[in-house]
């Protein structure tokens, strides 16, 4: 990402890009929808608003294509009273439609229960805004049950797999030759530093790629990250992360970055700030060699860190704080199965008689 303005941080640039993208998406929605997105601006990120805009657009696309009375209507001509014409049964049909539907671009789309719930949450929020301001008389979204979410098992690396992954990144070049060997040598220290950092701090991949070299403080072994929502936080790291970062920085000193990318901590092979997708592909590439049964992504490395920290400390509030969860219930929900394991061990730990 180009730093045309050297005073802008990576986070600021992403916000600007997302704001511009949102404006483009809003042009494809009914004009009255802008009021809603303007109203939620203070309490949501631009990225969240973009997701909501796409979700709301699917709803209007559904109305225009599936409702016979609206067949000849155009998106730009829809007014707010269209919302009052929708009944609870229409919302239920929409939920059914979301499971499998043709998108505006004639591509078949599907939604699992999480995608379904997110789209329904967006629609509820959209309706609530106009209902609260008495611009519509009814809110049919309140009459329809939200999709039920089933708990998903947390996918994480076991301690042995974590060690195997780091060992593989460090030594897999021994079996390589030719161009593959050259590429590996160019990316080895960077890849090891990124994976070690993700495993050793639990930061998000978006936070990782957004790091500038100035964000690392080896005096306190802390990194400054911009959390989801824009808040700033110092996250501390241990000796293994410190060593991996220092080794990478030594290699990084020999790279001449593309203009505007001088501050980026992690570079792509094009000498620009590395992107989220590049990190995701890199993690998947290495993880496939270590485990074939688990689909490991950067987020799974974050789950691995959270699991390890909770096992070591048993402090759910500490885990929530370090992971940057605003609500401890989010953390507790993810690690509920581990709580059950701890309760089982607690039952065995208490002896009432020495020889029952």
Region spans (language model):
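Conserved catalytic core of the tyrosine transesterase superfamily
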Residues: 1-356
């Amino acid at each position: 990402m180009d730093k045309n303005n050297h005073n802008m941080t990576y986070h600021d640039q992403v916000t600007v890009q997302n704001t511009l993208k949102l404006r483009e998406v809003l042009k494809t929605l009914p004009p009255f929808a802008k009021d809603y997105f303007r109203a939620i601006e203070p309490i949501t990120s631009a990225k969240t608003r973009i997701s909501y805009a796409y979700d709301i657009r699917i709803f209007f696309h559904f109305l225009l294509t599936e409702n016979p009375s609206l067949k000849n209507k155009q998106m730009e001509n829809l007014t707010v009273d269209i919302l009052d014409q929708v009944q609870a049964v229409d919302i239920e049909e929409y939920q059914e439609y979301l499971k499998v539907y043709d998108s505006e671009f004639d591509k078949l789309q599907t939604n699992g229960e999480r995608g379904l719930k997110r789209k329904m949450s967006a629609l509820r929020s959209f309706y609530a805004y106009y209902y609260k301001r008495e611009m519509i008389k009814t809110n049919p979204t309140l009459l329809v049950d939200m999709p039920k979410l089933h708990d998903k098992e947390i996918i994480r690396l076991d301690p042995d797999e974590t060690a195997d992954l780091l060992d593989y990144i460090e030594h897999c070049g021994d079996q390589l030759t030719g161009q593959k060997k050259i590429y590996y040598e160019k990316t080895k220290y960077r890849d090891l530093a990124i994976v070690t950092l993700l495993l050793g701090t639990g930061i998000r991949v978006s936070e990782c790629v957004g790091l500038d070299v100035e964000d690392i403080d080896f005096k306190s072994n802390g990194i400054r990250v911009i959390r989801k929502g824009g808040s700033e936080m110092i996250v501390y790291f241990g000796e293994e992360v410190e060593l991996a970062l220092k080794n990478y920085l030594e290699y990084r000193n020999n790279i001449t970055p593309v203009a505007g990318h001088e501050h980026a901590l992690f570079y792509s092979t094009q000498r620009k700030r590395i992107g989220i997708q590049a990190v995701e592909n890199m993690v998947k590439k290495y993880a496939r060699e270590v485990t074939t049964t688990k689909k490991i992504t950067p987020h799974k490395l974050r789950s691995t860190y959270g699991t390890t920290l909770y096992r070591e400390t048993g402090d759910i509030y500490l885990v929530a704080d370090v992971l940057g969860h605003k609500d401890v219930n989010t953390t507790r929900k993810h690690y509920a199965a581990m709580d059950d394991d701890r309760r089982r061990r607690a039952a065995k730990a208490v002896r009432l008689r020495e020889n029952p």
